[in-house]
Amino acid sequence: MTWRDEIARRVRGEHLRDAPLAPRTAVRVGGPADLLCRPADGDALSALLRAVRELGVPLSVLGGGANTLVADAGVRGVVLRLPQEFPGESTDGGTLVLSAGAPISRLPARAHAHGLVGMEFLGGIPGTLGGAAAMNAGTRLGEMKDVVTRLELATPDGTGFVPASALGYAYRTCRLPPGAVIARVEVRLHAGDVAASEALMREDRERRRATQPLDRPTFGSTFTNPPGEYAGRLVEAVGLKGHRVGNAIWSPVHANFVTNLGGATARDVLALVRLARARVKERFGIALETEVRLMGEFLDEDLEGLDGHAAAGGGPGAASGGVRPPEAT
């Protein structure tokens, strides 16, 4: 019995072998996963975490695929993708408990259905709630740390809620315990003017359409903004707005967005990222930090010149998926 057979036997849920990942990411780049798993519930998620630990199989977590770049060679081991809905979702007053796999785009409407507001900043953000909670996603209207009260974390030993105050939330990051995976997210909202909330979200969406390249595959902002600066302005200032490598390009619309013109490779994308970091560092003395999480089997030469966050696989709670399992059958 292979490790993939054993995981399928031990973990209730969906299991796809050699699953293409490019269609499951926002930038539409990357190779396949050895095994893509979608556990049926929290118990199955813990069973998966136990199985990969005992079998020595690497694990990566894929949310909605935003801010994620998958290697051209794909991802070794298991790629975990949570269901859009988990048993145990609930609404109690202004408190909502939602699956980490829930698409962000649906959440404001779900809150509005209960007369609640406070998630307007999520209206234009792609991906899943768990990914947004892990990276403290946000816009000019707010960020996740403003509404998250607790995260339910799954480990090989089970699941349990951890208060947000214990997770070290900061700009575009939080500190999850090693090996933990977000299963559900608890947010605290408040009653308010739903019509005004919807109008604010429409206004923000229109602004994004006018200023961001939303008509092409992109993982969103590539770099975090340095203190007192804008990464897009820096990339444009060093002459890279509209610069192309292969079929990837620094967008002519917004210079902090890499877009896929069709058939781009991860190597194309990383070449643009390395070039921008080098030029900005040389001219301004600023070391740009990526928002993009790398997943999979990258070559060492592709990772040269990247900041530690990207080269290590980025987002908390997931391995990079670049190490081969004991056998890959």
From Swiss-Prot:
It is an enzyme of class 1 (oxidoreductase). One of its GO terms (biological process) is peptidoglycan biosynthetic process. Its EC number is 1.3.1.98. PANTHER family: UDP-N-ACETYLENOLPYRUVOYLGLUCOSAMINE REDUCTASE (PTHR21071:SF4). SUPFAM superfamilies: FAD-binding/transporter-associated domain-like (SSF56176), Uridine diphospho-N-Acetylenolpyruvylglucosamine reductase, MurB, C-terminal domain (SSF56194). Transmembrane segments: none annotated. Coiled coil: none annotated. It catalyses: UDP-N-acetyl-alpha-D-muramate + NADP(+) = UDP-N-acetyl-3-O-(1-carboxyvinyl)-alpha-D-glucosamine + NADPH + H(+). Keywords: Cell cycle, Cell division, Cell shape, Cell wall biogenesis/degradation, Cytoplasm, FAD, Flavoprotein, NADP, Oxidoreductase, Peptidoglycan synthesis. This is UDP-N-acetylenolpyruvoylglucosamine reductase. Residues 202-227, 307-329 are annotated as: Disordered. GO terms for cellular component: cytosol. Its cofactor is FAD. Belongs to the MurB family. Residues 311-320 have a biased composition (Gly residues). Pfam families: FAD_binding_4, MurB_C. Cell wall formation. The keyword Transit peptide does not apply. GO terms for molecular function: FAD binding; UDP-N-acetylmuramate dehydrogenase activity. The keyword Mitochondrion does not apply. Residues 28-192 form the FAD-binding PCMH-type domain. The active site is at 172, 221 (proton donor), 291.
